[in-house]
């Protein structure tokens, strides 16, 4: 299961790293319990809280036709003190 798409690095998410909270975009069809079990198994950490929200897709215009991108889900995962997740940085070329 590839539940986590990629890590999110915004001003807020970088600030939350100090509170042992990690932010990432996940598959929109995934549930909280699926993501929690996947994070605990894959990274070997203990999750104490998860917050999620769905972000709307952005409008895209292609000539006279107006379309939109898909909406997506963002999770803020809080870990127990003493645990950490290595950065999920994907190199872009």
Swiss-Prot record:
As one GO molecular function, the record gives:
structural constituent of ribosome
Location in or out of the cell: Plastid, Chloroplast
**InterPro entries in the record:** Nucleotide-bd_a/b_plait_sf (IPR012677), Ribosomal_uL23-like (IPR013025), Ribosomal_uL23/eL15/eS24_sf (IPR012678), Ribosomal_uL23_CS (IPR001014)
A GO biological-process term = translation
Principal location listed in the UniProt entry: plastid
Q: Does the keyword Calcium apply?
A: no
Report which superkingdom the organism of origin falls in. Eukaryota
* Keyword terms, alphabetized: Chloroplast, Plastid, Ribonucleoprotein, Ribosomal protein, RNA-binding, rRNA-binding
In this record, what's one Pfam family? Ribosomal_L23
GO terms for cellular component: chloroplast; ribonucleoprotein complex; ribosome
Cystine pairings recorded for this chain? none
Q: Which PROSITE patterns match?
A: RIBOSOMAL_L23
- Subunit (UniProt): Part of the 50S ribosomal subunit.
Q: Which function does this protein serve? A: Binds to 23S rRNA.
The record's similarity note reads: Belongs to the universal ribosomal protein uL23 family.
Instruction: State what protein this is by name.
Output: Large ribosomal subunit protein uL23cz/uL23cy
In the UniProt record, the gene name given for this protein reads rpl23-A
């Amino acid at each position: 299961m590839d539940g986590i798409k990629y890590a999110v690095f915004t001003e807020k998410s970088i600030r939350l790293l100090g509170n042992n909270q990690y932010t990432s975009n996940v598959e929109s069809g995934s549930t909280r319990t699926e993501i929690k079990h996947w994070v605990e198994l894959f990274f070997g950490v203990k999750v104490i809280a998860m917050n999620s929200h769905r972000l709307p897709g952005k409008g895209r215009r292609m000539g006279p036709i107006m379309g939109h991108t898909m909406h997506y889900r963002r999770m803020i995962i809080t870990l127990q003190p003493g645990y950490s997740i290595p950065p999920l940085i994907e190199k872009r070329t």
